[in-house]
Amino acid sequence: MELTSLKLVNYRNYANLELDFSPGVNVFLGENAQGKTNLLESIYVLALARSHRTSSDKDLINWTAKETTISGRIKKNISETPLSLHFSSKGKKARVNHLEQSKLSQYVGQLNVILFAPEDLELVKGAPSVRRRFIDMEFGQMNPLYLYNITQYRRILKDRNAYLKRLQLKQTKDTVFLDVLTDQLVSVGAEVILARQLFVRRLQAAAQPIHAEVSNQREQLTLVYQTSIDFEEHADLEQIKATFAATLNRQRTREVMQGSTVVGPHRDDLQFIVNENDVAVFGSQGQQRTTALAIKLAEIDLMAQETGEYPILLLDDVLSELDASRQTHLLLAIQDKVQTFITAPSLSDVARQLIHTPKVFHVKQGEITLEAKHTSEK
């Protein structure tokens, strides 16, 4: 998979930008606050129809404008497909081959991306919500059914919480509608839990050999999906549904008192264990970074297995956060097989040695130029 071109209109600090990319490594060099991260964010948004930096689409629109458009062309095998996203006060519109998509779940997955940024080093020790979002965004790209189910789960959860709040405030005493919402939550939530368990097992299988190699065979990585519902490890879908329903029934009084749903996939977590120790609690900074690196590299292989093509990789100012050894493992792993976009103030000696014939852009105050050996492009 390859992103051959990108066009931005009124996107953050870019009023009008068109770029053509190398199928190999594309490097964007510049000082901080010049627009490098905005550029990589736009590629991420083009793929997933949402930003990793803000929950408000309005933040993506240039402050002088009322709407923004991101468009690009992706190449799979020998065919090219145009993609575009339009954001305005009326919402977002997604198009594939110039045809508007009725659901975003039909759009997401056309372009698959893996983002590795400094905040991803928080994947191991950050809040559980960081790890849930990681699972949802990465697995959602690979599996449209999972993306649909997690979207439905969030909608039902929002409705159920709103009704629990009404019960808490004694605005209603009728629990029949709560029963309906509970049944819906259990049905979709069990699908989400089962799918997440499968994803975590496959991610572990891909990450373990990478982690062992980066740690020079000194450490073994294990991933544990921690659910807020106490069911047997190898429970099937119907068993998960039954346990989820029983747990919600036991928690109903507490839920009404709190006005919110206290158990379910929205409360689950992912634990990283190295040599039988929780890396978030007992791991050194080096172990935490090795774990995060192994997970990101495993994602690339897993997505290639699932979709039949390698995703594109976005490295946003992350090389400077890795020591020479981890930089080497990362760059060798992606060498000549993954289209990569790198932002950095400057390239390290390791990167210059290992990156073959990169296409280098310089970014300054929202203006982008190619290095002298290329034709200038803005």
From Swiss-Prot:
Would you say which domain of life the source belongs to?
Bacteria
Q: Binding residues for ATP, per the UniProt record? A: 30-37
Identify one Gene Ontology CC term for this UniProt entry: cytoplasm
Keywords, ordered alphabetically: ATP-binding, Cytoplasm, DNA damage, DNA repair, DNA replication, DNA-binding, Nucleotide-binding, SOS response
Q: Which residues cross the membrane?
A: none
- PROSITE patterns per the record? RECF_1, RECF_2
| Pfam families assigned to the protein according to its UniProt record, in alphabetical order | SMC_N
The protein's matches in InterPro entries, at most eight in alphabetical order, are given as: DNA-binding_RecF, DNA-binding_RecF_CS, P-loop_NTPase, RecF/RecN/SMC_N, RecF_2
> What biological-process terms (Gene Ontology) are attached?
DNA replication; DNA synthesis involved in DNA repair; double-strand break repair; SOS response
Q: Under the GO molecular function aspect, what terms does this record hold?
A: ATP binding; single-stranded DNA binding
Q: Where in the cell is it found?
A: Cytoplasm
**CDD domains of this UniProt entry?**
ABC_RecF
Q: Which family does it belong to?
A: Belongs to the RecF family.
Instruction: Please give the function described in this protein's UniProt entry.
Output: The RecF protein is involved in DNA metabolism; it is required for DNA replication and normal SOS inducibility. RecF binds preferentially to single-stranded, linear DNA. It also seems to bind ATP.
Please report the name of this protein according to its UniProt entry: DNA replication and repair protein RecF
Q: Which organism is it from?
A: Leuconostoc citreum (strain KM20)
